[in-house]
Curated annotation (Swiss-Prot):
Originating species: Synechocystis sp. (strain ATCC 27184 / PCC 6803 / Kazusa)
Entry GO CC: cytosol
Catalytic activity: RNA(n+1) + phosphate = RNA(n) + a ribonucleoside 5'-diphosphate
Protein's UniProt name: Polyribonucleotide nucleotidyltransferase
CDD domains attached to this UniProt entry: KH-I_PNPase, RNase_PH_PNPase_1, RNase_PH_PNPase_2, S1_PNPase
Stored SMART domains: KH, S1
Keyword Flavoprotein attributed: no
């Protein structure tokens, strides 16, 4: 491809597309740049593997530290396993892209987005999403595009397109909208308890901006003389399809109408129909029968067509009758139960949340500021995280037996969504300096486990005594679209997620939304439908919230006795080195003496963590004494450190020494200093003078017995 540049004037900032220069062997490649942020996005297509029945699409985002002029840490000094942020951006690219490929496509597809340069103004993620659309178009991969994405922020009362990092951080909204000419295909947002109507307006505002980027891609296609690639669906084997429908339809409809079967009973009944009414009947056909020959040629044909028939009949039941497979109405939430304090208090907080067959146990742990997650080797400009949510999805939660692995993209994505939902209600760090980690263990899954994790997290935090501003609940909405008929489902379960067209998760408080995430399986939704789904989620969220508040109305007033106690004090930044000491000697000594964990921030904030308040207070007093300003007339219990002919040096506080002149040791004449004191002796001294160089002149004279007693008490406290 020849080199080609195109600049798009977009909302006051140019976006530049550069093609034909980099990655010439990739199917399609584009360097998309805004400001000093530049992302190379490639799309490559290869022959698919035999026998697969899914689209093998891989999306990888790579954030290189050289893009920000930095060298990685660690021994190897190179990037290692992608950080969580990179995984989330990979998912952000994948989610709006995947539904736009033909569902019958079986070629290997790989999208790779690599940030080559990055400034502190323009995030690379939405550039990568739009760049992926351009790369796919250039690679001539069948695709219902063009597709583009923008970020929407809220500064004051005004929505803005593609805000800077600072504007997002200081604002109340971080929303990404992706769309095609057919409608909206993906929404993801974190918000500071914004009302539903504000969120709807923000999505609409973003989708209008998306149209500009879609039109720019159309212009690019015209300039390059290319069109969107298309792919015809493979022919359906109508003979086998009709055979299965004739044998199984009525029995499937009967099973779908038996609402008391439950998930396992329904699955077993459907499997039984498939085995007895379809597979057994095909096995009994003569070898010359076209149906039997087709099935022998494609062993997966029966399974795929039977699944398609079940999907069709379930969707028809919802559209025609307004009844779901478990008998619920479209807007009805499954039965809910909650429990807090489920585990002993050695676990700082625990919450068990049940919704239908979905069960999530969330566990909260409180730590000191030093437990914050260090993001120093992440390309993005966050330094650390003080609230962490981790989501685990073991195989037994769906009745499977398979090897346990480290968290995959799904687990990371679900954990991040639940984390995002809770962050707006956390107390300010100055009021509650703890680092908080919540782990959500999915013990049983039948849909909406990420929103179950939001509810479980809220329960666990309140049980742990974390003073959250408001409790957060969440619900997952689904969609069935058959022609012009649209049905929105509240609180979808697993089969409705699998056979439906949308998974729209909404979390928030009774004041507004804190997080949402919408994924589509079709090529776009209108604003009208998106708006209706958001509004339909509100009564569901409030209903769930009522159930949670019936279990625990407010955070516990006391922390678990096993949670660390934190004390803080502020020292002058220039004293930090003194507290740490050479090679960390001083602070290690305090830690060993008090069994406390001590963290010192760059601004001089010292946080002391201990399971025992007395130990923490002793450490605080030791650091305070080291860094406090001494005044003339104050009395201390000190220790003699060395003797010289004219006097003795006494350490009155850690790191603070003064001298007692021989004439100040006692009343009357002293022949030798050693006659009065020796090295290691404890002595009561008063600060007689602080000279112009800050040196302490001490005395043992004129000290009242009460002053001496107070000095001894202070010394005993550290």
């Amino acid at each position: 491809m020849q080199e080609f540049d195109k600049s798009i004037s977009f909302d006051g900032r140019d976006i530049r597309l550069k093609m034909g220069t980099l990655a010439p062997q990739a199917g399609g490649s584009v360097l998309i740049q805004s400001g000093d942020t530049a992302v190379l996005v490639t799309a490559t297509r290869a022959k698919g593997r035999d026998g697969i029945d899914f689209l093998p699409l891989t999306v990888d985002y790579e954030g290189r530290l050289y893009a920000a002029g930095r060298i990685p840490g660690g021994f190897l000094r190179r990037e290692g396993r992608p950080p969580e942020k990179a995984t989330l951006i990979s998912r952000l690219i994948d989610r709006p892209l995947r539904p736009l490929f033909p569902h019958w496509l079986r070629d290997e597809l790989q999208i790779v987005a690599t940030t080559l340069s990055m400034d502190e103004e323009v995030p690379p993620d939405v550039l990568a999403v739009t760049g992926a659309s351009v790369a796919v178009i250039l690679a001539q991969i069948p695709f219902k595009g063009p597709m583009a994405a923008v970020r929407v922020g809220l500064v004051g009362d005004d929505f803005i397109i593609n805000p800077t990092y600072r504007e997002v951080h200081n604002g109340d909204l971080d929303l990404v909208v992706a769309g095609t000419p057919a409608g909206i295909v993906m929404v993801e947002a974190g918000a500071n308890q914004l009302p539903e109507q504000d969120i709807i307006e923000a999505i609409d505002f973003g989708y209008e901006a998306v149209q500009d980027l879609i039109n720019a891609q159309r212009e690019l296609m015209t300039d390059l003389g290319i069109t969107l690639a298309t792919s015809e669906p493979p022919p359906v084997n109508t003979a086998v399809e009709e055979f299965i429908a004739n044998r199984a339809s009525k029995k499937i409809i009967t099973v779908l109408g038996q609402f008391d079967l439950g998930k396992d009973g329904r699955d077993a009944a459907l499997d039984e129909i498939k085995a007895t009414e379809v597979e057994t009947a095909i096995a009994e056909l003569p070898e010359t029968d076209p149906v039997k020959q087709s099935v022998e040629e494609d062993p997966k044909l029966v399974g795929n067509l039977y699944k398609a028939l079940t999907k069709k009949l379930m969707r028809k039941q919802i559209v025609d009758d307004g009844v779901r497979v478990d008998g619920r109405k479209l807007e009805q939430v499954r039965p809910i139960s909650c429990e807090v304090g489920f585990l002993p208090r050695r676990v700082h907080g625990s919450g068990l949340f049940n919704r239908g067959l979905t069960q999530v146990l969330s566990l909260a742990t409180l730590g000191s500021p030093g437990d914050a997650q260090d993001l120093a080797d992440d390309l993005h400009p966050e330094d650390e995280k003080r609230y962490l949510h981790h989501y685990n999805f073991p195989p037994y939660s769906v009745g499977e037996a398979r090897p346990m692995r480290s968290p995959g993209r799904r687990e990371i994505g679900h954990g991040a969504l639940a984390e995002r939902a809770i962050i707006p209600v956390l107390p300010p760090q100055e009021d509650f300096p703890y680092v908080v980690r919540v782990v959500s263990e999915v013990l049983s899954s039948n849909g909406s486990t990420s929103m179950g994790s939001v509810c479980g997290s809220t329960l666990a935090l309140m049980d742990a005594g974390v003073p959250i501003k408001k409790p957060v609940s969440g619900a997952a909405m689904g969609l069935i679209k058959e022609g012009d008929e649209i049905r929105i489902l509240t609180d979808i379960q697993g089969i409705e997620d699998f056979l439906g067209d949308m998974d729209f998760k909404v979390a928030g408080t009774d004041s507004g939304i804190t997080a949402l995430q919408m994924d589509m399986k079709i090529d776009g939704l209108s604003m009208e439908v998106v708006s209706k789904a958001i509004m339909q989620a509100l009564p569901a969220r409030l209903h769930i919230l009522d159930k949670m508040l019936a279990t625990i109305r407010e955070p516990r007033p006391e922390l678990s006795p096993f949670a660390p106690r934190l004390l803080t004090l502020k020292i002058e930044p220039e004293h930090i080195g003194m507290v740490i000491g050479p090679g960390g000697k001083t602070i290690k000594g305090i830690t060993e003496q008090t069994s406390c964990k001590i963290d010192i921030a760059d601004d001089g904030t010292v946080t002391i963590a201990s399971s025992e308040g007395e130990r923490a207070e002793r450490a605080r007093q030791m650091i305070y004494n080291m860094t406090r300003k001494l005044n003339e007339g104050e009395v201390y219990l000190g220790r003699v450190t060395r003797i010289i002919p004219i006097g003795a040096f006494v350490e009155v506080l850690p790191g603070k020494e003064g001298m007692i002149h021989i004439s100040q040791l006692t009343e009357g004449r002293v022949g030798k200093v050693e006659d009065e004191v020796g090295v290691g002796d404890e002595v009561i001294v008063k600060v007689r003078e602080i000279d112009s160089k800050g040196r302490l002149n001490l005395t043992r004279l004129g000290i009242h017995p009460d002053e001496a007693a107070e000095a001894r008490r202070n010394a005993s406290r550290g």
